[in-house]
Design a protein with these regions (language model features):
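Short pre-active-site segment immediately N-terminal to redox-active cysteine/selenocysteine motifs
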Residues: 68, 76, 122-126, 131-134
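Short microdomains enriched in Cys/His and/or Lys/Arg
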Residues: 47, 88-105, 113, 142-160
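Non-transmembrane alpha-helical segments in soluble domains
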Residues: 45-48, 70, 127, 131, ...
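Core AdoMet radical
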Residues: 112-122, 131-152, 165-180, 193-211, ...
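Generic structural signal for small/hydrophobic residues in well-ordered secondary structure
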Residues: 19-22, 44, 72, 119, ...
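Accessory C-terminal segments flanking Radical SAM cores
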Residues: 1-93, 97, 111-114
Length: 251
């Protein structure tokens, strides 16, 4: 295993976290108000080598702390296993790509070994711990109707297709990913090419199909699936906490 300095993380060379607003981050716990770019404006390729992403890579190579990485820095100080530790442990086999980093921080090869994409805020529930940013249902209380926020870059699917062979793990969340047609489209693309990355989900487990497409028919094409169910309570308490949930229908 490669030995890394304390402020170095493999994430900017192996990962991108894209939110439903189009905001792009080097990872999902990078400071939420410090996106490196927005793919609705710049696309995946533009975000991969945006000015802020290039600056972040150079800071890490110089072992300089970055404000956006404060959560991992705090975890490390407390002896808690951080995302930084996760990336450096699980993706150190991509270190040769780090060596290709140019003087301005550019990395020519877009490598999304771990791809975290949140296509939209489309959701069938209105959890008390959530809000309109992550649930279209919450917008009903604010503007009287659901407001769907979604990635809308015109070249998104072409760019995703180009990077598919580099993906080792896809993380789906939302909104509710199993409620989104884009989620099934991405799985179709992977299946058509015979690609089998790990699939990781954060789901409310209330529905496993969409318009006749059942998730079990998709999952049988993949070898590793991690399905994390978001539950706070059970029974009536669960229905109270997660408005729209019927406990008897939870998978």
């Amino acid at each position: 295993m490669t030995e890394f300095k304390e402020n170095f993380c493999m994430a900017p060379w192996t990962h991108m976290s894209v939110w439903q607003t189009g905001d792009a981050y080097p990872c999902c716990i990078y400071h939420w108000d410090m996106p490196v770019d927005n793919i609705n404006r710049s696309g995946l390729k533009g975000a991969w080598n945006s000015e802020k992403m290039r600056e972040l890579r150079l800071r890490m190579l110089s072992n300089e702390p970055s404000e956006g990485c404060a959560k991992c820095t705090n975890y490390d100080k407390q002896g808690i296993i951080s995302y930084r530790h996760k990336f450096n442990t699980e993706y150190d086999h991509h270190y040769d790509l780090v060596k290709t980093t140019q003087e301005d921080g550019t990395v020519e090869q877009m490598n999304l070994a771990y791809f975290d994409i949140r296509f939209s805020n489309l959701c069938n529930m209105k959890c008390r711990s959530c809000g309109p940013h992550f649930s279209s249902k919450w917008s009903e209380d604010l503007i009287g109707k659901p407001e769907i926020v979604q990635i809308n870059h015109q070249d998104m699917w072409e760019e995703i297709e180009e990077v598919l062979p580099t993906i080792e793990e896809v993380y789906f969340t939302g909104g509710e990913s199993l409620f989104m047609p884009q989620h099934y489209r991405l799985l179709d693309m992977l299946i058509e090419r015979g690609l089998k990355p790990r699939l990781t989900y954060n789901s409310n487990a209330t529905r496993l199909s969409l318009k006749g497409k059942h998730i079990k028919d998709y999952w049988q094409h993949f070898d590793h699936i991690f399905y994390c169910v978001s539950l706070d309570q059970v029974g009536k308490k669960a229905e109270y906490t997660r408005a729209g949930q019927t406990w008897d229908t939870v998978f």
